[in-house]
Design a protein with these regions (language model features):
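Short beta-strand/loop segments at the ligand-binding rim of alpha/beta enzyme cores
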Residues: 2, 22, 71-78, 121-125, ...
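Conserved, mostly hydrophobic/aromatic
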Residues: 8, 38, 46, 91, ...
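Conserved anion-binding
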Residues: 11-12, 16-22, 96-171
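Glycine-rich, proline-tolerant flexible connector loops at the mouths of alpha/beta enzymes
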Residues: 45-61, 103, 165-175
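Glycine/small-residue-rich loop that forms an oxyanion/phosphate-binding "nest" at active or ligand-binding sites
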Residues: 52, 60-117
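Catalytic cores of alpha/beta
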Residues: 72, 76-98, 180-216
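Glycine-rich phosphate-binding active-site loops on the catalytic face of alpha/beta enzymes
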Residues: 90-111, 167-169, 198-205, 212-232
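Short, basic, low-complexity termini and linkers enriched in Ser/Thr/Gly/Pro
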Residues: 238-257
Length: 257
């Protein structure tokens, strides 16, 4: 499976939360230094979340994204606060290979579908953040009235390929991922490139997700807290299925891929 380390950013610093609660913020240092550390260890992908952006409903930490994409060769997906066409283009121009969007697919479905058509399914990741079976939005501060099943049904049928699913009650707890939830998604949508997120607390959790047939996993706090080690043995299991490379935007069209 594909291993995807995560960097969450608040006020330009690398942080982790527990269950999306901003009051539980723990600071781990500089995002660029952490990204370079992941690259030095042999990682190829990176998931970057602008938590300030998610909370304020517009992209905030674009400078941190730009620094990472400029000074590393990591393939970066970026999310958090992407609500407008300008936000999306800004993220791509700052070097994001993919952009994760979730709230907009709830609040403005036509805009998400327009992006899907314009930029293509390979350039977007649908963020499916779930709490008690319902999709949450805006930095997990609000619960929508949309069930996860209905959310996925609509957008997989529309051509979505990549889904990042976070079980909010597990996120940052290190108590283990929601494997049964992810298995149920894969059973219904075997064509989905599902990225599991939330709860990973050990190497065994990663191996369990791999055994369950989950294509990719995001992890963060488990690494920062020393619960998992990016050992050569684990890195050998990193099957890079993403074929995305960093692309440039010219007049809102993708070039130089």
């Amino acid at each position: 499976m594909e291993l995807v380390p995560a960097i969450d950013i608040i006020e330009g610093k690398c942080v982790r939360l527990t269950k999306g609660d901003y009051d539980t913020k723990k600071v781990y240092g500089d995002p660029l230094e952490m990204a370079q550390q992941f690259e030095d260890l042999g990682m190829r992908r990176l998931h970057v979340v602008d938590l300030d952006g998610a909370k304020s409903k517009h992209v905030v930490n674009i400078a941190a994204l730009k620094a990472i994409t400029t000074h590393t060769n990591l393939v970066v997906d970026f999310g958090g606060g992407v609500k407008t066409d300008e936000d999306l283009v800004m993220a791509y121009e700052a070097g994001a290979a993919m952009v994760t969007v979730g709230s907009i697919a709830i609040t403005d479905p036509d805009r998400y579908l327009g992006w899907l058509q314009k930029y293509g399914a390979d350039k977007l990741i649908l963020g499916a953040d779930v709490r008690n079976g319902m999709v949450s939005i805006n930095g997990w501060k609000e619960d929508s009235d949309v069930r996860l099943e209905d959310f996925l049904l609509r957008y997989m049928a529309a051509g979505t390929k990549n889904v990042l699913c976070t079980e909010i009650s597990r996120d940052g707890t290190l108590e283990g991922p929601a494997i049964e939830l992810y298995k149920s998604i894969m059973a219904r949508y075997p064509e989905c490139y599902l990225i599991a997120s939330g709860g990973v607390g050990s190497t065994e959790d990663i191996l369990a997700l791999e055994a369950a047939g989950i294509p990719a996993v995001v992890f963060g706090k488990a690494y920062y807290e020393g619960k998992i080690s990016l050992s050569p043995a684990l890195l050998k299991r990193d099957g890079r299925k993403s074929k995305i490379v960093n692309c440039k935007l010219s007049n809102s069209k993708l070039t130089s891929c």
